[in-house]
């Protein structure tokens, strides 16, 4: 019998960039298509997406993209992947709407969408897929039961078990248990919160905290959160109605997502409660709530611009209550701390998660993960969606529940897993890695470019310009030194003059400089100017010699 191949293209050893291909016979379906924030050392990079070389090589066999929910780490790569490997997209109403919006921003059309609801079953090639309702920090999140002749795989997606969700739709434990009773070949379950004991707090708790903060606030209330957290936004709106406040949205993603959510009925805001940011001056401070982006301290976000007095319409001032309803994504802690400090400097009363319950996670903690394992009862378990220590801890948790060690498989990027009822084998290698997006360029920035950017950012640049006669090969001008990001020339004229003399000494070794000599001349200038500067001030600027024919 043919085997099912599970091919992770992202989401292993990292929190984000989630993408997994499932292959049986001639058919491939892809679960999720996410991006991840660039690391601090990825200078100038806007976004990081999965390497889809394997999908491009097999593009005629890719039948569908199955999307668990609409967070960026699950849909952020769609504008870059779908044009290169097109296939129909399956997702819930909000998920498809968010992807359509992203594609429209990139002027991408001709992608077929299929809107599904929980419990729907779709047939895609050799696969039958059932979508299963789960609770998460965004509406429309689903798990999936993916069935092929080799067996059924449960993909949990991001989930938690919230018994009091805002929309009243709890994680469908009955359907998950029913699949467990039938027999599940394997389960891929998220590992984000596996290090946390107990249960994740209910989203309803945030509404109670908001109620108390609204009751006590005397001035404007400004709340920063992720635009995709519509259940939390709805709780803010409900408190605005109760306390007679108006609400406005600030930040491109906040405006776009809330507008889209209202259009499809996922967010309900009475017309007389919603106002435009330009109308804020028409209301007293205690009548205003501003919902904005910037919970991660992003430099160009709405909250950061308000705190730094760079926003055209809004500045933080004495008497404002600012609520940061999120926890920092790993790597963003310093930026968030800086923005909190700046908010205090502006005179605001700042509320964040260390002070009050203004954020809860959307991911399952240990006891919820144990319940998922107990209900699904998979033969094989593959932890996903987490850094390596999280995958390891999740594997250990599965073994504590009685799963044989040989049936718990921690995959690495570049590996594939071949599964049948009788055996599981790790194969590979599969092309894998990260593709960096810089502006409109996708994949044209690699490690060499990043190394140069890092070099420039740390030590600056010196350009050495030399003019050489095309006819005689004699030096006609220069060497002229131009410094950028290295030293302030007017205050370091002696240093720059010395470097110029070093470059001149290199040129004087040549009676004539023919084109065949250019490489050796440039290398000589680079090496000797570098050594001169390092000996004097122990710094390593990038040296860029330029020879111009005159």
Predicted regions and their residues:
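Conserved hydrophobic residues forming the short capping helix/wall of the S-adenosyl-L-methionine
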Residues: 103, 398, 533
């Amino acid at each position: 019998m043919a085997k099912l191949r599970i091919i992770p293209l992202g989401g292993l050893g990292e929190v984000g960039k989630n993408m997994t291909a499932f292959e049986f016979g001639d058919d491939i379906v892809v679960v999720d298509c996410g991006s991840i924030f660039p690391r601090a050392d990825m200078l100038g990079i806007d976004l990081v997406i999965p390497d889809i070389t394997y999908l491009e090589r097999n593009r005629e066999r890719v039948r569908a993209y199955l999307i668990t929910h609409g967070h960026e780490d699950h849909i952020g790569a769609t504008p870059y992947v779908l044009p290169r490997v097109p296939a129909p997209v399956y997702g819930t109403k909000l998920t498809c709407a968010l992807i359509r919006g992203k594609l429209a921003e990139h002027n991408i059309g001709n992608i077929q969408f299929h809107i599904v609801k929980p419990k729907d079953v779709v047939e895609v090639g050799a696969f039958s897929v059932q979508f299963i309702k789960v609770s998460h920090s965004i509406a429309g999140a689903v798990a999936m039961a993916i069935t092929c002749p080799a067996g059924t795989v449960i993909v949990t997606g991001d989930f938690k078990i919230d018994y009091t969700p805002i929309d009243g739709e709890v994680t469908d434990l009955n359907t998950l248990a029913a699949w467990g009773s039938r027999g599940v070949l394997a389960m891929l379950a998220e590992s984000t919160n596996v290090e946390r004991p107990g249960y994740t707090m209910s989203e309803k708790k945030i509404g109670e905290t908001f109620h108390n903060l609204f009751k006590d606030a005397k001035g404007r209330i400004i709340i920063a959160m992720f635009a995709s957290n519509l259940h939390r936004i709805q709780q803010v709106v409900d408190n605005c109605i109760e306390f007679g406040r108006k609400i406005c949205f600030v930040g491109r993603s906040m405006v776009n997502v809330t507008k889209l959510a209202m259009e499809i009925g996922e967010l309900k805001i009475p017309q007389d409660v919603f106002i435009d940011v330009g109308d804020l001056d028409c209301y007293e401070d205690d009548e205003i709530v501003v919902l904005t982006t910037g919970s991660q301290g992003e430099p160009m976000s709405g909250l950061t611009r308000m705190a730094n007095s760079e926003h055209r319409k809004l500045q933080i001032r004495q008497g404002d209550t600012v609520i940061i309803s999120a926890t920092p994504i790993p790597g963003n802690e310093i930026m968030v701390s800086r923005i909190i400090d700046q908010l205090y400097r502006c005179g605001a009363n700042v509320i964040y998660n260390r002070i009050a319950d203004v954020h809860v996670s959307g991911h399952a903690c240990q006891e919820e993960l144990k319940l998922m394992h107990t209900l699904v009862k998979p033969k094989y378990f593959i932890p996903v969606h987490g850094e390596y220590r999280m995958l390891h801890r999740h594997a250990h948790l599965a073994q504590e529940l009685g799963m044989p060690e040989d049936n718990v498989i921690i995959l690495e990027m570049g590996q594939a897993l071949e599964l049948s009822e009788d055996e599981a084998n790790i194969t590979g290698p599969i092309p894998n890695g990260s593709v960096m997006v810089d502006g409109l360029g996708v994949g044209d920035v690699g490690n060499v470019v990043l190394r140069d950017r890092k070099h420039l950012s740390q030590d600056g640049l010196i350009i050495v310009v030399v003019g050489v006669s095309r006819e005689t090969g004699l030096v006609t001008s220069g060497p002229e030194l131009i410094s950028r990001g290295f030293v302030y020339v007017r205050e370091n004229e002696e240093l720059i003059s010395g470097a110029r003399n070093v470059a001149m000494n290199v040129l004087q070794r040549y009676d004539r400089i023919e084109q065949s000599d250019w490489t050796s001349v440039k290398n000589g200038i680079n090496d000797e100017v570098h050594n001169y500067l390092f000996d004097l001030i122990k710094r390593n600027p990038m040296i860029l010699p330029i020879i111009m024919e005159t």
